[in-house]
């Protein structure tokens, strides 16, 4: 069974929207998580195929902001939770709030930690490959260990009269950059599904995991 080459990556996108607020105390940054670009075209020398991700979940346990404040002192703000997130919800899932004093921060790192919960994986993505010849094969990607999404920004300003929402968008269009058609053609199929995990098709898992950890960018909107 031919499975076409696939290019997917993770892009972490943080969107900040400001609105007026009367309080002048520490401010809450609300973290949200969503997915974008759920279908990718995959090319072969003969004809193009596609992959469509149709469902997925994440087990979020910690959100964190690390930075240097105006005194050049390293600071950390975090909040713990235990939430099973539907990554394919029509609206971004809210993870919780990180409380931070107003001010200007530099070398800012935004982090979301995922951790397995019992038999539930830290991250699951389900979908299907459609080859250039029209053959459809289900696929599941599983992360069964703790991992962290991290994105960086040079400078961030938090005022005492604004609320901020940080939306992390997982771009499913670039996650498997570096995976060749030959590797997919040789993938092990278990009960009709290509399972990509730390114990199945590990060569594919290692590439996707590296992209998941490393491929991030941050965009700020005030």
Task: Map each language-model feature to its residues.
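C-terminal motif of bacterial Sec signal peptides marking the signal peptidase cleavage site
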Residues: 15-18
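A short, solvent-exposed, low-complexity linear motif enriched for acidic/polar residues
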Residues: 20-222
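Sec-dependent signal peptide recognition
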Residues: 2-9
């Amino acid at each position: 069974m031919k499975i076409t080459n696939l290019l997917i990556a993770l892009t972490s996108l943080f969107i900040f929207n400001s609105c007026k607020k009367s309080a002048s105390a520490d401010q809450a940054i609300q973290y949200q998580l969503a997915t974008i670009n759920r279908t990718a075209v995959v090319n072969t020398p003969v004809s193009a195929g596609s992959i469509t991700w149709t469902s997925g979940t994440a087990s979020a346990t910690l959100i964190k902001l690390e930075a240097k404040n105006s005194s050049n002192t390293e600071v950390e703000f975090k909040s713990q939770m235990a939430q099973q997130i539907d990554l394919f919800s029509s609206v971004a899932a809210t993870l919780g709030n990180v409380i931070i004093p107003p001010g200007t921060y530099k070398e800012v790192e935004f982090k979301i930690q995922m951790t397995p919960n019992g038999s539930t994986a830290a991250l699951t993505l389900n979908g299907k490959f459609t080859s250039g010849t029209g053959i459809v094969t289900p696929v599941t990607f599983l992360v069964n260990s703790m991992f962290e999404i991290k994105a960086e920004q040079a400078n961030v300003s938090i005022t005492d009269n604004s609320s901020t929402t940080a939306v992390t968008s997982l771009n499913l269009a670039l996650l498997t950059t570096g995976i060749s058609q030959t590797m997919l053609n040789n993938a092990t199929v278990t009960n009709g599904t290509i399972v990509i995990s730390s114990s199945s098709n590990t060569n594919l898992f290692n590439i996707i995991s590296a992209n998941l950890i490393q491929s991030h960018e941050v965009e700020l909107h005030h």
